[in-house]
Structure formats: C-alpha cells, structure tokens
C-alpha cells in the first residue's frame, strides 16, 4: 500500500501483498460456536507423516492462535478501501441498548469531515457513530456483572482453548508450571470468561464502533498477549505506511495495536487503521490533544481533551492510555532521578500541573471520563507516567506513589463498570521485577497488568528487544497479562516493518515462555509438536511450526540449501556422524530389532560401537 501517493489514497489504496500471503502448509479454519455468526478463526498447520521401520505414522494437524484476521485467508476478499466486514454488528444491535447518531459528537471530528481538502486521503466509507442510549452502560464488564454471557465472551472462550480437547494425547508430557496464584482452568468456558471480566481480572477491549473486531481478552488467567506500537511522527511516515505496519504486525502475532501517531492527519490515519483492523486498537489521546494546541502542554484544557476522547471513541478506538495518576505532589519525587520523567504522556501532564500549580484535569475529571468510556465501551489503560526510564530509578517512591493512585482510580472505574488495565515499567533489573508484579496485584485489585518490557539492562541500544524480552518473559510468568513490544529501534528511532516483525517475534517468544512457566493448559502443545518433528528430522514441519517459518528456512538453507537436505537425518551443526538425535533413533531401532528394553539396547549398542571404534584404529577423526 505504501507506494500509493496520499492524494490518491481513497481511490487506489491496496493491501500490502506480504501481509496477505498464507503461512506455508497452513490454512485458516473457523471453529463454530453456539450460533451461526460465532465462527472463531484459527490457523491449522498440516504436518507430514513420521517414517518408521514399521511404515508411516500420521501426525495430526496443529492448531495455533491466529491474530491475522481475514488477511491470511485465501477465500476472503480484501479491499482496504472498503474495510473489513462487520463481525460484531448484529451482536451489538440485538442488545438494543445503543443508538446511531445523526452526526459526530466531536467538534474536531466534524471539522475534519467538513474539510474538502482531506477528501483524497479520507477513508471513503465512513459510518455514523454509535453510542449508548441514555441511561445505559454498554461495557462488557457491565454485561458480565449482570450475569450476561455475550457472544464476545463465547468467542473468546473458544479462541483461548485452541481446540485443546483434540490434543490431550500430545500433552501426556506436560509441565504443570508455577502460576504464582493465577487460576488456569484445564478448559475455559464462556462462564469463566464472564466471571473474570465481572471481577475486573480481565478486560475485553471492544468499542461498539469497532464492529470489525475479532474479540480477545487480556487477563492474568488467560494466554499472555502482546501489543505492537505503530504511528507516524512529524518527521516520518504516512497513512499508507501505518496501515501496512498494522497488517504486518497482526500477521506475526500482535494481539493489539497502539496507534501513537503524533504527525499530520492523525484523525484520518486512525480511521484507516480501525476500519481495517481485526484486533483492538489503543491510543494515547493526550498526544492528539497536544497537537491541537500547537504542542504547548500548558495550553491544554479539559474541554479539548474531552472532545478528543469522544472523537476517538466514535471512530472505534478500543482502549485509551490515560495518565491520570500523575499528581502534582508526585512531580517533585522525580527531581533526584537519573533520568527524570521519560513517559511522553507523563511529562506532558507533569508540565501542565507545574504550569497551573494544580491537580491534573485527568485526575479531577476522572469520573466524567468514566461516563464517556462506558457510553462506547472503551477500556482504560491507566498510564504509568512516572515509570522508571533507567535501572537506577526502578521501584522508587515516584513510581509506586503513582501505582497506588492507579489502584484508587481503578476502583472508581469499576464503580462505573468500566474495564480497566494498569500500565507498568519500564527499566527494572531482574531481581526487582517480581516486586512490581506483587505490588500491582495488591494495589490494583488484580486488574490486568500491561508492561513495557521491562528492560533488564541499559547497555544495549540496538538490542533492546532482547534486554526487554528477558524482563517481559519474567514478568509475564509472574502474572502480567499483556506485554508491550520493544523493537531494535527503541531509544533510537521509529521502527520500520522489519523492526516491527523482529519486536513481535521477540515478544511472542517471551509471552509463550511465560505461558509455559505458568502451566497454561494448551501452551506446551506446540513445543511438543516441534520437538517431535525435530527428533524425526521433519525439516519442513520444523520450519512451519515455528513462529517465523521464513527465517527458519532461510537459516537452514544458508548451509544446506539443497532440497535433499530437507529430508536428511542431520543438520549442519553436527553433520551425519555426530547427530545426537540420529544416534538416539538408532538405539530405538536397535532395541526393536533385538527385542530389548531401551536401556539394555543402549548398553549393548555402546559395547558394539566401542568394539567397532577399536577395530578401525582408535582414531578420533577420519577422513570423509
């Protein structure tokens, strides 16, 4: 899509071809729910047969969680100028608690729509916004607390289970894990989803104006999720590039995407992204509000911010990062820090508080913000504006003072049945990570934790996807529900598509490692399938089971490029004579032939190999 000039965007925009290619040996499947319009997408990987001395053994296909939406479905017709189909429209309409507005409620939104100079880059098929009817609350938390299981909740239960019942045999070898108090049922039910949302331990980010959304859940007792950040700046990127980044991010496994645009045409960029996104979209509304006052934080007002919230809610943004915990009294606590306030949103609000010498309007108007959130079912992501920006500042008084305030604000949000998660650090050495998780659980009533890493060392610019991936795996194990990815460009510049992919793969590894360590019931299925394929030298299956089949195949072919190497019973690491797995297979075959038990065969086989070694001259190395 990025090759299209913006003046022709509305008529000529095309989807990124790389983003819509099906994964090798994979197909999109849909698991049916209790009603015809609940069809949960998953990816099924076809596996090759196992070859044994007794013949062939079938390996069942492997089902994996899929965030790519219809983009990787060859049967789907993708036209980003039209947007995705409205999966949730009927579910929302049948609840009969919303109304379609005759016009946008936001003054800024109306101004943008009336500006004919924007016609060429505006998404052409704008829909009138939807809002809760007077006196109604349309949040998934509100429904859950009424005892209602919504179609979204059933969709999520099916999605999280990943057809687990079909893989019980593959889980014969399964580590129970250490969950640190999380409750991970052996099978998720819609009722369990409802109860977790009602309790506030999980959120379903699903704005009523984002009808294209495939429902997902963020919570400690579910699969660990990851978020990918995209967004333009004043110096780089276009609408087309940001849509490409979104489709690219969800291909590789982003569960949500945050649009952090601060450049031109923020409103139009967001519309294109939301209309074409099957995953929840988050934003930091204060960024756009700041642009509306020319970048001068002290000129921000509650009225401008309120209008921005409504503008974005009516476009379909699913969760807002709001830095309402940055209070005037906490700003001096950052004075002796090595790196001060590093959160963009936090620094904006700190500057406003100091300029006006009063509490932040985000804090004083918090209940009014809740009224807006529940009218559209936008979830809170309560921002950590005072997070540490260096190891030296980790776990200090400013960070934890804000966290305690976020806990108080969570209780207020829950009083309004508004879904809420809490953002966390940041830069934290490994031995201080668990304290962050424990304190968040205690302060915030087990609301989902959403962390940026944390980075475990500050010495590796260019490799902060690794320094943070270490911390992400740890804090995910301890109970964090969603991990915000870090790319190799962190602290250095805006990421491109390759950086986005590398950050996502790194964080998919971290999230999956956390699921394994927690003992999530379905997590080890994929690992066991990979291990079996590896032991049986099913190279194509190894590539395809992996998170990045393209790179796995490329690395293999660098040293063994011929097709024959993809059926060889060795790799380039050890070669044909020293492959440990090949030796183990030989021992098993020897045991079958001799009618021996495995350990007896091993002893006898080793004796025969020793005799063979001596007869060949007892030389360690031979010419080949």
Curated annotation (Swiss-Prot):
InterPro entries, A to Z: ThiC (IPR037509), ThiC-associated_dom (IPR025747), ThiC/Bza_core_dom (IPR038521), ThiC/BzaA/B (IPR002817)
Metabolic or biological pathway: Cofactor biosynthesis; thiamine diphosphate biosynthesis
Native species: Nitrosococcus oceani (strain ATCC 19707 / BCRC 17464 / JCM 30415 / NCIMB 11848 / C-107)
Lineage: Bacteria, Pseudomonadati, Pseudomonadota, Gammaproteobacteria, Chromatiales
Cofactor note: Binds 1 [4Fe-4S] cluster per subunit. The cluster is coordinated with 3 cysteines and an exchangeable S-adenosyl-L-methionine.
Entry protein name: Phosphomethylpyrimidine synthase
Residue ranges of the region described as Disordered: 48-70
GO biological process, one term: thiamine biosynthetic process
Sites where the protein binds substrate: 229, 258, 287, 323, 343-345, 384-387, 423, 450
EC number: 4.1.99.17
Catalytic activity field: 5-amino-1-(5-phospho-beta-D-ribosyl)imidazole + S-adenosyl-L-methionine = 4-amino-2-methyl-5-(phosphooxymethyl)pyrimidine + CO + 5'-deoxyadenosine + formate + L-methionine + 3 H(+)
GO cellular component terms listed in the entry, alphabetical order: cytosol
Top-tier EC class: lyase
One Pfam family per UniProt: ThiC_Rad_SAM
């Amino acid at each position: 899509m990025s090759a299209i000039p913006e003046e022709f965007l509305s008529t000529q925009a095309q989807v990124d071809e790389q983003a819509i290619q099906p994964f090798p040996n994979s197909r999109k499947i849909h698991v049916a729910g209790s009603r015809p319009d609940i069809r949960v997408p998953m990816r099924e990987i076809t596996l090759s047969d196992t070859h044994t001395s007794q013949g062939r053994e079938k390996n069942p296909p492997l089902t994996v969680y899929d965030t790519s939406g219809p983009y990787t479905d060859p049967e789907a017709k993708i036209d980003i100028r039209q947007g995705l189909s409205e999966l949730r429209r009927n579910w929302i309409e049948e609840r009969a608690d919303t109304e379609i507005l005759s016009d946008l409620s936001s003054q800024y939104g109306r101004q943008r729509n009336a500006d004919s100079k924007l016609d060429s880059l505006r998404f052409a098929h704008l829909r009138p916004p939807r809002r809760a009817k007077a006196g109604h609350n349309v949040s998934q938390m509100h429904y859950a607390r009424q005892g209602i299981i919504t179609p979204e909740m059933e969709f999520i239960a099916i999605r999280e289970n990943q057809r687990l019942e079909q893989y019980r045999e593959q889980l014969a070898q399964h580590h129970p894990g250490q969950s640190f108090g999380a409750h991970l049922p052996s099978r998720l039910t819609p009722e369990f989803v409802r109860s977790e949302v009602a309790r506030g331990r999980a959120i379903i980010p699903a704005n009523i104006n984002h009808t294209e959304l495939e429902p997902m859940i963020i919570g400690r007792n579910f699969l660990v999720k990851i978020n990918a950040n995209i967004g333009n700046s004043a110096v780089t990127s276009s609408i087309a590039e940001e849509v490409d980044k979104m489709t690219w991010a969800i291909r590789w496994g982003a569960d949500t995407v945050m649009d952090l645009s601060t450049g031109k045409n923020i409103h139009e960029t967001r519309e294109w992204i939301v209309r074409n996104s099957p995953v929840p979209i988050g934003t930091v509304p204060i960024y756009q509000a700041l642009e509306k006052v020319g970048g001068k934080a002290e000129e921000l007002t509650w009225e401008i911010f309120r209008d921005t919230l409504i503008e974005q809610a009516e476009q379909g943004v699913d969760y807002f990062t709001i830095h309402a915990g940055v209070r005037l009294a906490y700003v001096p606590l950052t004075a002796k820090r090595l790196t001060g306030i590093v959160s963009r949103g936090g620094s904006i609000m700190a500057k406003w508080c100091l300029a006006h010498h009063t509490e932040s309007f985000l804090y004083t108007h918090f209940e009014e913000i809740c009224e807006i959130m529940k009218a559209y079912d936008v979830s809170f992501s309560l921002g950590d504006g005072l997070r540490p920006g260096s190891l030296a500042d980790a776990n200090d008084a400013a960070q934890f003072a804000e966290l305690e305030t976020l806990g108080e604000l969570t209780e207020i949000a829950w009083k309004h049945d508004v879904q809420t998660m809490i953002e966390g650090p940041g830069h934290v050495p490994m031995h201080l990570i668990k304290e962050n998780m424990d304190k968040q659980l205690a302060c915030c009533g087990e609301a989902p934790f959403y962390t940026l890493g944390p980075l475990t060392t500050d010495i590796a610019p260019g490799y902060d996807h690794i320094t943070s991936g270490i911390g992400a795996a740890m804090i995910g194990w301890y109970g964090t529900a969603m991990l915000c990815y870090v790319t190799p460009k962190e602290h250095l510049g805006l990421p491109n598509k390759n950086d986005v992919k590398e950050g996502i793969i790194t964080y998919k590894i971290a999230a999956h490692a956390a699921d394994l360590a927690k003992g999530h019931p379905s997590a080890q299925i994929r690992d066991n399938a990979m291990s079996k394929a590896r032991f049986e030298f099913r190279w194509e299956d190894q590539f395809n089971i992996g998170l990045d089949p393209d790179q796995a195949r490329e690395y293999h072919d660098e040293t063994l490029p011929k097709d024959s190497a993809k059926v060889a019973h060795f790799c380039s690491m050890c070669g044909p004579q020293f492959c440990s797995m090949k030796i183990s297979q030989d021992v098993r075959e020897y045991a079958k032939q001799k009618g021996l038990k495995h350990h007896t065969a091993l002893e006898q086989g080793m004796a025969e190999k020793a005799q063979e070694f001596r007869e060949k001259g007892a030389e360690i190395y031979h010419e080949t």
